[in-house]
Each structure stands twice: as structure tokens, then as C-alpha cells.
């Protein structure tokens, strides 16, 4: 996975810088999302693995994408096809979104709780995280009944384990030391 990220990063950075310069971040995010889905299609993936000439491959890919790509998006597809990198489009999208979130000061926070959180609890957690991290927070909530009670929050490098399972584990470690 890290190899794909390394390959995808320069393409994502170039697309991102261009999108910022033109004020078209959301349009580029949509184009890359569409291209990523096209590249993940099993028939297209087989085509990308085949022995098709890069120029022909770019034209086929662009024709599949149709009007979803503007002129500059088509240029990106041509460059990636010339370098045999169309398969890393999902990675380009991933890296682009990371850059976009950094630019817009948005961070994804994974919140795992023992029970389903109410809308009010989600709003409270989001507000407290935004104050602490000084960023907009996008919550991704999930339920894990093995936590027994409480929540685990992961946002970037920050991990807050306020679950009963985590507390019991820390208590056990303390008693054993």
C-alpha cells in the first residue's frame, strides 16, 4: 500500500496544486472519484494490465469517463497513461483527499463506541474534538460491543481510549507492574 501511495503522491500533489490555483477543488475531487471508480472496475482493470499502447489506453479511459473529465483531467489521464500509472488512480484520489482535508483544515475522526451514539452525543464529541484539534472534524462512527462501555476516538495521530475494555487493560498492566 505504501508503494502505491508513493507512486500516487506526485500526481495527487500536481492535481491538487492545479485545483487550488484554479479554485476547482470540489470539481477535481469529483473527477478523481469518478476516475478511481472506473479504474477499479474489473473490466477496466484487465485493460490496464493488458498490452495496450499508452496513447490508446488514455483515449479508451477518457471515452469511458465521458463528460466527467474536463480538458485538464484528460491531460492528467494522458500523463498517467504514458507512465503506466492509471492503476494507481485510487491512490491518487486518496492522496488528493488527504491534501484537500489538510488545506481545508478538516480531519477524519473514527469514533468506536460500545452502543450506537445519539445525534447529540455525536455533536458533543465533534464539537470537543474541533476545539481540541482546531480543525473541522468529520466523524466516522461505528459500534463495537466488545468495548463494554465508552468510546475510542482516533483522529490522525491522536488516540483517546475511554472504553471500559481499555481502562481494564490499563488497570491490569498497573497491577502487574
Swiss-Prot record:
InterPro entries named among the record's database cross-references: ATP_synth_OSCP/delta_N_sf, ATPase_OSCP/d_CS, ATPase_OSCP/dsu
Keywords: ATP synthesis, Cell inner membrane, Cell membrane, CF(1), Hydrogen ion transport, Ion transport, Membrane, Transport
TM region positions: none
Membrane-protein topology: Peripheral membrane protein
GO cellular component terms given for this protein: plasma membrane; proton-transporting ATP synthase complex
Keyword check for Transport: yes
Cell compartment(s), UniProt: Cell inner membrane
One term of GO molecular function: proton-transporting ATP synthase activity, rotational mechanism
Main location (coarse class): membrane
Alphabetized HAMAP family for the sequence: ATP_synth_delta_bact
Database matches in PANTHER family: ATP SYNTHASE DELTA CHAIN (PTHR11910)
Function statement: F(1)F(0) ATP synthase produces ATP from ADP in the presence of a proton or sodium gradient. F-type ATPases consist of two structural domains, F(1) containing the extramembraneous catalytic core and F(0) containing the membrane proton channel, linked together by a central stalk and a peripheral stalk. During catalysis, ATP synthesis in the catalytic domain of F(1) is coupled via a rotary mechanism of the central stalk subunits to proton translocation. This protein is part of the stalk that links CF(0) to CF(1). It either transmits conformational changes from CF(0) to CF(1) or is implicated in proton conduction.
Subunit record text: F-type ATPases have 2 components, F(1) - the catalytic core - and F(0) - the membrane proton channel. F(1) has five subunits: alpha(3), beta(3), gamma(1), delta(1), epsilon(1). F(0) has three main subunits: a(1), b(2) and c(10-14). The alpha and beta chains form an alternating ring which encloses part of the gamma chain. F(1) is attached to F(0) by a central stalk formed by the gamma and epsilon chains, while a peripheral stalk is formed by the delta and b chains.
Sequence similarity: Belongs to the ATPase delta chain family.
Protein name per its UniProtKB record: ATP synthase subunit delta
